[in-house]
Each structure stands twice: as structure tokens, then as C-alpha cells.
């Protein structure tokens, strides 16, 4: 890697935003009913569905109801009812399940919600005493799909003889079944799971796919027109709120970018909002959602400044100013960074202004996270400018931080409600295994994408490149190893609800960060940098309503 000294780097090749002023000027297509009418109808339907939870007396009905409500994306209305139902399901265990599908579904729902179920309880439904797979389960694609999804909640203590080989077994037979005669909607559900297993799928992404599938299941026992209507109305009403916020944040970004004039950065405000929305999509999380989206954008600005424009000396001065966090240090910076630095500080001040008096301390953690990120960006810049390829261990220790999981885990807490305790902030800012694992998912998937597509930023050598050089192996071996580290990281994330039960609501939000990375880097793409590849997905979330 060539040393670039103190000269500015070449201009980037980032494509311009695919959105422009789209959301600033956007006028939603009128629906058949007004927002007020939808909100009133939702309140009525919510009461009806609450009654369904109360009316469920057997475990099978409770399990199916929880599954449907979650996959339709309306579980945020029924948190207490779901917790009560799952506690009852947990007491019943898996042993009395009548099928592989039923056992695997219970296993997944319980583990996702922080109820521990030993893997052995599920393995009984798929293996004989001698360890061989039970004859006949290969002819049960619905059961195999449920097994495949459930087994992806594997943790570190469960080894390769239980859930991991169940994943391999189920995948092999699902791929074969998919090539044959699977019917809709099972065929589509298998296809989605083979791309991203359900426990790693974003709630809103699954809801968009599952709502029309649920509509087609009117002959099924789990079908309810009341639940379906609630899901459609809730999605559309929330989408209107998200469209209003996109208008606001797009204008914020237009004003900010116009003032600071950093033409070399990735113009991705809609993508930053999407990232935040994947963590906080609910109506009651509007403050948290908008703060996190802005933190995303500010970290992206910082990343691109270090990676594609600043000389080494400029990078050092910028980091020094960020560590001191004093506007008077602006005089130390080159002209093009002065406005940027002042705007960073003023935006963090605005974050604090949005907090109640007893919440003001949160911004101290927010700033500290940004400072830590800057320090690690500088280390990468030092490596790059000195032509250094670090050891794999050193590279990972720095790049997992620059992947942003820590600063974003702090940022997602800033605007939250009572769940965002001091304990939660200490957990997020510390070297916590779950936060680190989320960072590994982000970093390794990003690096595998960059290796496949070719880097278009002046980054230091990636984890893939460092592994190849250090171990003198072909790229296929390095990529396989990095991919195995992603799977190890998911085991750590899966363990977090049981290791940190008091922080479960926060753990869920952090897990959503890892899920969003999985979608952004699906099939080794980079849907943030190359956001043209992601436009259709964003349209399904923010432009197209669901027909009523």
C-alpha cells in the first residue's frame, strides 16, 4: 500500500444520492381512509386482538397467535400479552409438541424473547438415540423450515453436534425441496430464510413480505381478518409518520451539507434514516429514531473525511479537536473542516436539548462514543498513510470499533424512554461481548463485500486482506474463515438475552443493528455505499403503501 504523505487523496467515486429532494417534495398517495380514521380503527382492532390472547387456552393456539402477530409487525401493540403467552408456553415445554414444526416454532419464539430452552429438547424431534436424523423429516418442508430458523438461535455452548448440524441438514433438504415442488407461500418463505434466517430478519422487512402471504391463508386455522386488517392499517399509518420524518431529516441534511460543503462524502441520508428505523420503527420511538439517524449521518461524514480526503496531518488535528470537544479549537483546522467540526458540536448540543433534565447525562456517553470512533479512525489513517498492513488481530481490534457498532449502540439509547438506564449506557460503552459481536458482524460482512466488489475508498487493508497476508492462504480460505467468525459473533448475540436479562429491551435494539447489517451486506453487496442496489427495498418501506 503506497504511502501518501500529506497530500490530499484522490476524489472518491461515490455515486450521488438516488433520492435528491424526493422526500422533501413527497406527497403521499391518498388512501381510502384518513389517518384519524385509521388510528381510531386500529384502537378498536387492538382491543379485539387482545381478546384473542385472552381467549387462547391451549399452547398450540397461543404459539400460532404470537408467531403471526410478530411476523405481521404488530407485536409492539401486545408486548404484555405476548410475554404472558410465552411464559405459559415455556411452562409447557416442547415435549408435548405434536410435530417438528410445532416444537421448532416454540423453541424459536421462546429463545427470541429471552426464555431459555435447552437444545436437547428440540434435538429429540430430529435425531434418533444413535445421533442419526429421524426418517421422514426430509419429507416435511414446513417442519424443516421451522427447524432451520430455530437452529439459528444457537449459542456457543451447544457445539456442532446439535443445532449447527441441524442447520446444515435442514438447508441441504430445503434447497432440494425448493428446486422441486414447494407451493406458495412456503416456497417464498424458504427462499427468504435461505437468504436471511428469520431470527436475523428485520421486523419490518418480514412484515412487508408476510402480510400478503397471510392474506392468502384464509383457509388456515391461524387466519383472522381482524389481525390482517390491523397489520395493514398499522403499517400504513406508521409509514405516514416515517414519511413526515424523512421530509424533516432530508431538509436537515440539505441544510447541513449545504453549509459545510463536503462534496466528497456519501450522500446517504435516506439510508441513514432506514438504518435507524430498523432499530426504532414504533411511533413511540420518534425521538430515538431521529437522533440515531443523525448520529448515523455524522459518523458517516467522519468516516469519509478520514478515509477519502484528509491528509494525515489534517486527520491528526481533527481528532485532537474532537477529543478536546471545544469550539475554540476550530482555529487549528483547515478551512474545509472548520464548519464540519462546529456543526458536529452544535448537533450534539441539539441532541442534549431534546432530552429531559434527568436524561442530560446521556449525551456525555454519546460524545464519548463519537470520540472513541474518531480515535480509531485516526489509527486506520496512520496505518494507511505509512503503508502498513497490520496483523489480523490488530486490524480487527481497531476496525470492529470503526464499523460503528459501539457508537451506534450508544446513539440508539440516547432518545429512548425509561429502558435507557445508566446501566444500559455503561453496558453499551464498555467492551461488552454483545456490542463487540455486533461490531464483528458489521465489520466482517463489510470487509467481505469490499473484497468482492473492490474498495473505492482509501481504506487500510481489510480483515480479509490481513488474514490472507498473515496466513499466506488463498482468498477462498480467508473468506471462509471470516464468514465463520460472523457465525461465532451471532452465537454471542444469541446468548445476550440470557446473559443480560435486565437489559433485554436494549439487547433487542442492539440485535436489530446486526440484523440491519445482514440486510445491507446480503450476498456481499454494500447497499450503503452502492445505494442504487437498495432503492427498491427502501421504496417498499417508505413509498408504497399496503393496499387495504
From Swiss-Prot:
Q: What is its main location?
A: cytoplasm
Q: Name one GO biological process term.
A: response to abscisic acid
Looking up InterPro entries in the UniProt record yields: Isoprenoid_synthase_dom_sf, Terpene_cyclase-like_1_C, Terpene_cyclase_plant_C1, Terpene_synth_N, Terpene_synth_N_sf, Terpene_synthase-like, Terpene_synthase_metal-bd, Terpenoid_cyclase/PrenylTrfase
> What start and end residues bound the annotated signal peptide?
none
Reaction(s) catalysed (UniProt annotation): (2E,6E)-farnesyl diphosphate + H2O = tau-cadinol + diphosphate
Enzyme nomenclature, EC number: 4.2.3.173
GO function term, MF aspect, one: terpene synthase activity
Position of sequence motif DDXXD motif: 303-307
Which pathway does this chain act in?
Secondary metabolite biosynthesis; terpenoid biosynthesis
Organs and tissues of expression: Constitutively expressed in aerial tissues, but barely observed in roots.
What the record says about the induction of its expression is: Induced by fungus spore (F.graminearum) inoculation and methyl jasmonate (MeJA) treatment in leaves. Triggered by abscisic acid (ABA) in roots.
**Keywords recorded for this protein, A-Z:** Cytoplasm, Lyase, Magnesium, Manganese, Metal-binding
Cellular compartments annotated: Cytoplasm
Annotated Mg(2+) 1 binding lies at 303, 307
For the ligand (substrate), the binding residues are 303, 307, 443
Cofactor(s) essential for the protein? Mg(2+); Mn(2+)
pH effect summary: Optimum pH is 8.
| GO CC, one annotated term | cytoplasm
Tell me the domain comment: The Asp-Asp-Xaa-Xaa-Asp/Glu (DDXXD/E) motif is important for the catalytic activity, presumably through binding to Mg(2+).
Q: Can you tell me which family this protein belongs to?
A: Belongs to the terpene synthase family.
Record note on quaternary structure: Monomer.
Purpose: Sesquiterpene synthase that catalyzes the formation of a blend of sesquiterpenes and sesquiterpenoid alcohols. Converts farnesyl diphosphate to tau-cadinol.
Protein name listed in UniProt: Tau-cadinol synthase
Q: Its encoding gene is what?
A: TPS7
Amino acid at each position: 500500500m503506497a504511502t501518501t504523505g500529506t497530500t490530499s487523496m484522490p476524489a472518491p467515486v461515490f455515486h450521488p444520492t438516488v433520492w435528491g429532494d424526493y422526500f422533501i417534495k413527497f406527497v403521499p398517495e391518498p388512501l381510502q381512509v384518513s389517518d384519524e380514521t385509521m388510528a381510531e380503527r386500529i384502537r378498536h382492532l387492538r382491543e379485539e386482538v387482545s381478546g384473542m390472547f385472552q381467549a387462547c387456552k391451549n399452547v398450540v393456539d397461543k404459539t400460532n397467535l404470537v408467531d403471526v402477530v410478530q411476523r405481521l409487525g404488530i407485536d409492539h401493540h401486545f408486548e404484555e400479552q405476548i410475554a404472558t403467552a410465552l411464559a405459559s408456553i415455556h411452562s409447557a415445554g416442547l415435549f408435548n409438541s405434536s410435530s417438528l414444526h410445532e416444537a421448532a416454532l416454540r423453541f424459536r419464539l421462546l429463545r427470541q424473547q429471552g426464555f431459555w430452552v435447552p437444545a436437547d429438547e428440540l434435538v429429540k424431534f430430529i435425531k434418533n438415540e444413535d445421533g442419526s436424523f429421524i426418517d421422514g423429516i426430509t419429507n416435511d418442508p414446513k417442519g424443516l423450515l421451522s427447524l432451520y430458523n430455530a437452529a439459528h438461535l444457537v449459542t456457543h455452548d451447544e457445539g456442532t453436534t446439535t443445532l449447527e448440524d441441524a442447520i446444515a441438514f435442514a438447508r441441504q433438504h430445503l434447497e432440494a425441496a425448493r428446486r422441486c415442488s414447494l407451493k406458495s407461500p412456503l416456497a417464498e418463505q424458504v427462499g427468504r430464510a435461505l437468504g436471511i434466517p428469520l431470527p436475523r430478519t428485520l421486523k419490518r422487512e418480514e412484515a412487508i413480505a408476510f402480510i400478503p402471504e397471510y392474506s392468502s391463508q384464509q383457509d388456515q386455522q391461524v387466519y383472522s381478518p381482524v389481525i390482517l386488517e390491523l397489520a395493514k392499517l398499522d403499517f400504513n399509518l406508521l409509514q405516514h409518520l416515517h414519511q413526515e420524518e424523512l421530509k424533516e431529516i432530508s431538509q436537515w441534511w440539505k441544510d447541513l451539507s449545504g453549509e459545510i460543503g463536503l462534496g466528497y462524502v456519501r450522500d446517504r441520508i435516506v439510508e441513514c434514516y432506514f438504518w435507524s428505523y430498523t432499530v426504532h420503527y414504533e411511533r413511540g420511538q420518534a425521538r430515538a429514531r431521529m437522533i440515531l439517524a443523525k448520529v448515523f449521518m455524522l459518523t458517516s461524514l467522519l468516516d469519509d473525511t478520514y478515509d477519502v480526503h484528509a491528509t494525515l496531518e489534517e486527520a491528526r488535528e481533527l481528532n485532537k479537536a474532537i477529543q478536546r470537544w471545544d469550539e475554540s479549537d476550530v482555529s487549528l483546522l483547515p478551512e474545509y473542516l472548520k464548519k464540519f467540526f462546529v456543526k458536529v458540536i452544535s448537533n450534539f448540543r441539539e441532541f442534549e436539548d431534546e432530552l429531559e433534565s434527568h436524561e442530560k447525562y446521556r449525551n456525555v456517553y454519546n460524545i464519548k462514543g463519537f470520540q472513541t470512533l474518531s480515535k480509531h479512525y485516526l489509527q486506520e489513517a496512520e496505518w494507511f498513510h505509512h503503508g502498513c498492513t497490520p496483523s489480523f488481530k490488530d486490524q480487527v481490534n481497531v476496525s470492529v470499533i470503526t464499523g460503528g457498532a459501539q457508537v451506534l449502540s450508544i446513539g440508539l439509547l440516547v432518545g429512548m424512554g425509561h429502558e435507557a438506564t445508566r446501566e444500559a449506557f455503561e453496558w453499551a460503552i464498555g467492551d461488552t461481548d454483545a456490542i463487540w459481536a455486533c461490531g464483528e458482524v458489521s465489520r466482517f460482512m463489510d470487509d467481505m463485500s469490499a473484497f468482492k466488489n473492490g474498495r473505492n475508498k482509501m481504506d487500510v487493508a481489510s480483515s480479509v486482506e490481513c488474514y490472507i497476508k498473515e496466513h499466506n492462504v488463498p482468498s477462498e480460505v480467508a473468506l471462509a474463515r471470516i464468514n465463520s467468525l460472523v457465525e461465532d459473533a451471532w452465537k454471542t448475540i444469541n446468548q445476550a438475552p440470557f446473559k443480560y436479562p435486565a437489559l433485554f429491551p436494549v439487547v433487542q435494539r442492539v440485535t436489530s443493528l446486526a440484523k440491519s447489517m445482514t440486510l445491507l451486506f446480503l450476498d456481499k453487496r454494500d447497499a450503503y455505499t452502492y445505494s442504487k442496489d437498495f432503492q427498491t427495498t427502501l421504496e417498499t418501506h417508505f413509498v408504497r403503501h399496503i393496499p387495504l
